[in-house]
Amino acid sequence: MPAQVSHIIAAEEALRLALPELAETWGIGSDWGLAKDCADDRAAAWFRFGAQGPDIFYHNQRTKPSGIHYGALAHRRNYGLAVEAMTAALIEAKAGFDSREAAWLLGFATHAAVDRAIHPFIVHFAGWQSPLIPESARYRSCHPFLERLLDIHILGTLRGLPIGSCNLEGLLPLGGRERCEGSDGGSFDAALGRLLAKGLRAAFPAAAGADFLIERRIQNAIADAKYFIRVTNPSLTSAGSQSLLPWFDDLSGWRSMALIYPEKLPTGLDVANEEGKTWEHPAGDGRSYTASHGQLFDEAIASAAAALILVAEAIAEARIGAGFASAIGNGGLSVADEDGIPVPPRVSKPLPLKEVMEEEFARRIRAEQGLAAGRV
């Protein structure tokens, strides 16, 4: 799945395309000049956080009860049903575009389009570990590392910025649970928990319908996602600040690079397929492409913009039209067949990402040792 920065940029570009007046109202433009201020109380920040979609559940590995299984479910099926139910809830609550709930939901509505467009590309070029193929162990941790390389690529392409200048604490609401109030006066994280619970119960009645802890799981996922985003913030990418990373030391090994942003793309490696080489869909069903990451990103923006228009029109008209959920899409967000049914990956041609990670790890260890020597 694309990482945090890619989802933010795709959502912003989709909003500027679909709802330019709202983008202007929220201060979302082609640069991040407003990102220097604390983001906690701004609609734009919650829109960007919503764009992280159900990925927040994958980060829910510190706080119990966990909702990590909802991340897997939401990536497999019924995303459109979840968005439809939450849109209906906002219509019933008469929540307008000035509410944080609406801002978050609009962001959430963009997530599926971005995953569907780009995730197969990532799987093809990163590979995966199979327990049946021992030599595939080299590909473990390469997937999230490629996600971060593609963040670097798209940030440079569409924002003209180096990754080290990207401070997510200025773009996302990463404060504590009680920093922002919801429309009912309580914690906004709690309000968000109630809204997302309605979406999950509509999409996954068997799993979520009787889950009396679902709102607590969602709040825990939000808290853990905020923590994860803070400690993997691209602004910590430089060798001078890597000592702030809680998992990095000389014993952590090359796999510890999986969640760390290199300062620049590796020389001589076409991570974005800008040369237009043919690659196969990892489903192994004969689909093949020559699209670059940038071209796929443009497709993702267009599809996300269509989703934004659907949700915005429904809220503005206080009515959900026929076919809403299917237009958002209920198929899988990762490797799926042409009908959207999730299938295991079968075909890939991985880039030499392990070697890049090993080189990056060695470089950072040398830099850390140099810093340590300077402190003596």
Question: Residue spans of the language-model regions?
Answer:
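N-terminal leader/auxiliary helical segments
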Residues: 1-107, 112-376
